[in-house]
UniProtKB/Swiss-Prot annotation:
Record field: catalytic activity: P(1),P(3)-bis(5'-adenosyl) triphosphate + H2O = AMP + ADP + 2 H(+)
CDD domains: FHIT, nit
GO CC entries: cytoplasm; mitochondrion
Motif (Histidine triad motif): 407-411
Biological source species: Drosophila melanogaster
Molecular-function annotations in GO: bis(5'-adenosyl)-triphosphatase activity; deaminated glutathione amidase activity; nucleotide binding
Domain CN hydrolase: 33-279
Complex formation: Homotetramer.
Membership in a protein family: In the N-terminal section; belongs to the UPF0012 family.
Gene that this polypeptide is encoded by: NitFhit
EC number: 3.6.1.29, 3.5.-.-
Protein known as: Nitrilase and fragile histidine triad fusion protein NitFhit
């Protein structure tokens, strides 16, 4: 009898282990996807370059890739500043329409690593992400300009290219949260770290590295960015001679978060490399090497300025109160701005921290930097909307300073000529408002927040 029981128990244990293994394998499948990184040699012939892109899409599809990453200048490489401006198009142009149709017909995401986007007398170097429906999922405009002037050489990218104004938040895709960068951005670690902090698990650096700098630094930099951010890194590259003056290094790569090279197109002129991106490995890596948990935000901090706000997804605590997400019109990493229950002047809003802490001195370095950045952004927003040139910005830091809600927050109040008989009377009104002014309705506050949110979207 005992033998039968033991055999039955062993059978049950084996069955459970087999089921767990199947579940583990299925989980890995659900979290993994095949991606392709392309390599090409663009010239000033846009039609020929498009033919190369079509060929790379075909190869990516044949390898069952759900996403193809193309290099910087996948549209063309101009032979002069004048030609570059002449060949550039807007994102609503004919070439972009062809790219979008290509993504839609093949049901594949495409990273257009750097197209020349027309912008008045200059261009933007724009990294455009298309989804499988051919829609624009995101546009990032290159931040860092390669400007060098020496006795031997004068090379100023900013003569032709207008630098971008902000980082773009990571984009949700079938292969994870993707952080968008371009070429020379690779030499700056700060954006990569910020993108990881914002949720990126894959960084992409489409490039046209020169032969000399590529040979010296390309692989080292890609692996460094992967290791320090614990992200997959994908870098599509141009290769070969584009014209008599310009040669690119090539070696399109996919790098793992551990710094291993998963794919390298080497020196093939038209090629793709593929790799399986398995996001399940990230959690294990974060647990065994929790570098981002060990960052000393009380000693140093990185802050992304002009970052576009996400649509608020949850209500926020304000001490023991709850701020309805519909009244929040801006969110940063650590702070949020919302419309006020009782206003001293029209446009009186509040900025507070996501973490509940009563005093300004209780904020860490990252929260302080983010708080003041957010306050300045909101102040500029209100002055544009209400056509004013002044604002009272104040924080009542503690009960004896007039704080009634024990959660650090700034009051931002647009000022107008003659709005108070005596300028400092605004502080008296600030203390009196709880007794004297009735609370505004939730509908009023939501409507006001929608106006501010739309304005932020439009100026972005």
């Amino acid at each position: 009898m005992s033998t039968l029981v033991n055999t039955t128990r062993r059978s049950i244990v084996i069955a459970i282990h087999q089921q767990l293994r199947r579940m583990s394998v299925q989980k890995r499948k659900d979290q993994s996807a095949t991606i392709a990184v392309g390599q090409m040699r663009s010239t000033s012939d846009k039609a020929a370059n498009l033919s190369q892109v079509i060929e790379l899409v075909d190869r990516a599809k044949s390898q069952n890739a759900c996403m193809l990453f193309l290099p910087e200048c996948c549209d063309f490489v101009g032979e002069s500043r004048t030609q570059t401006i002449e060949l550039s198009e807007g994102l609503d142009g004919e070439l972009m329409a062809q790219y979008r149709e290509l993504a839609k017909c093949n049901k594949i995401w495409i990273s257009l690593g750097g197209v020349h986007e027309r912008n008045d007398q200059k261009i933007f170097n724009a990294h455009v992400l298309l989804n499988e429906k051919g829609e624009l999922a995101a546009v990032y405009r290159k931040l860092h300009m390669f400007d060098v002037t020496t006795k031997e050489v004068r090379l100023r990218e900013s003569d032709t290219v207008t630098p971008g104004y902000c980082l773009e938040r990571p984009v949700s895709t079938p292969v994870g949260q993707i952080g968008l960068q371009i070429c020379y951005d690779l030499r700056f670690a700060e954006p990569a770290v910020l993108l990881r902090k914002l949720g990126a698990n894959l960084l992409t650096y489409p490039s046209a590295f020169t032969y000399a700098t590529g040979k010296a630094h390309w692989e080292i930099l890609l692996r460094a960015r992967a290791i320090e951010t614990q992200c997959f890194v994908v870098a599509a590259a141009q290769i070969g001679w584009h014209n008599q003056k310009r040669q690119s290094w090539g070696h399109s790569m996919i790098v793992s978060p551990w710094g291993n090279v998963l794919a390298d197109c080497s020196e093939q002129e038209l090629d793709i490399g593929t790799a399986e991106v398995d996001l399940s490995v990230l959690q294990s890596l974060y647990q065994t090497m929790p570098c981002f948990e060990h960052r000393r935000n009380d000693i140093y901090a990185l802050t992304a300025y002009n970052l576009r706000s996400k649509e608020p997804t949850q209500d926020r605590p304000f001490a023991t109160n709850i701020v309805d997400k519909r009244t929040i019109f801006y969110e940063s990493e650590h702070c949020f701005a919302f419309t006020n229950l009782r206003c001293v002047v029209k446009g009186h809003v509040l900025v507070s921290t996501k973490r509940v802490t009563p005093r300004l001195c209780g904020l860490d370095c990252a929260e302080m930097a983010d708080m003041f950045t957010t306050v300045c952004l909101v102040q500029r927003l209100l002055e544009k909307i209400y056509q004013t040139t002044s604002a009272t910005v104040t924080v009542q830091d503690g009960a004896q300073a007039g704080q009634t809600v024990p959660h650090v927050h700034f009051h931002i109040m647009p000022r107008r000529l003659g709005d108070f008989g005596h300028n400092d009377q605004i502080y008296v009104k600030l203390d009196e408002r709880a007794e004297e002014k009735p609370p505004r309705t939730i509908e009023e506050r939501i409507e006001e927040a929608q106006i501010y949110r739309k304005f932020l979207t439009d100026i972005s």
